Amino acid sequence: MTELTPLIRILEESYADVLTMEKTQFFSQGQYRLKRAENVNMRTRNRWNLEQENNTWKVVDPNYTHLRDEVTRMRMEIHPIDSRTGGVPKPANTVAARARYNQHKCLPAELIPENISPDGELVPDLSNVNLVAAWTIVDGHATITLHKIIDAKKLKSCLDIPLLGNREDQSKIRYEAAPENEMLIPNLIDEETKHSEKKTEAENKG
């Protein structure tokens, strides 16, 4: 996962760009919130394409930040956390999206099939793995956690990997299968949700 570490910086920069753009337009805060995640996603995708040409993770969607690793063939799509629950976002109401949220449980290393990489090396074949990168921004700082979700209805995950912005720190993480509990990310609420709640409280008091 060390190759994904630039995603933290790129996401933060994209978010900052979107906030700056909003200052030049005239929409309600509700309209901004509806479009903000989509705009951040698109800018993140475009930045990754431009800045990470030599990265093994390549963009595979014309509109969204959906990536695939050329070495292991693993896929990843990035989505904001559910602002109402602070948890992993639900899948879109499509067959393909639900399929990505219903995967086989995590296998021990010895049972993972192998394949030949483009460089001719023997590598794990993770072509059937789809990760969901759930992100939030708090005070301008991004938090991203990668999940392998195995139950679309209950949002159960068998793997949770915090994504760090530093390759050295990321390489030190030892990945272990997560308890198959409902995946929630407590205490992570994005900026717009906090600001919206404060605004609502002020209006109610007024």
Model features per residue range: what roles?
Residues S127-G206:
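Glycine-rich, aromatic-bearing surface loops/beta-hairpins
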Residues N39-T56:
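Amphipathic alpha-helical segments
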Residues M1-E38:
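Interdomain/boundary linker segments immediately adjacent to catalytic/signaling cores
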Residues R84, A92, Y101-H104, K156-D160, ...:
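Glycine-rich loops and low-complexity Gly/Arg-rich segments
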